[in-house]
Amino acid sequence: LTITDLQIPNYEHVASAEEDDYRGFVAIHSTKLGPAVGGTRFWKYENDEAAIRDLLRLARGMTYKNALAGIPFGGGKSIVLRPDGDIDREKIFRAHGRFVNTFGGQYITAED
């Protein structure tokens, strides 16, 4: 699993990861209220820029949603880029799980 940190202003941590057919992103907008919580979107985007733009918008939105709900969680989001053709979903999502685990509990996800 190859992980690359991305420097994005006003976000605590943004990174991408790749392994075989897996490509994904995680954005942590804020952990001020607790670990960042947000779903994982499995989607085909036009390009990486579009995926990152959506990722950042959704992570920021989760910060506000969780704060307004009064729950002790910050905001984050992840995206798994859906590859073309036949795919091994289990292999792809296991790679994503390994990526999420590198955040040491600072990001908690579920399906989008």
Where are these regions (language model features)?
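N-terminal ligand-binding/catalytic initiation module
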Residues: 1-112
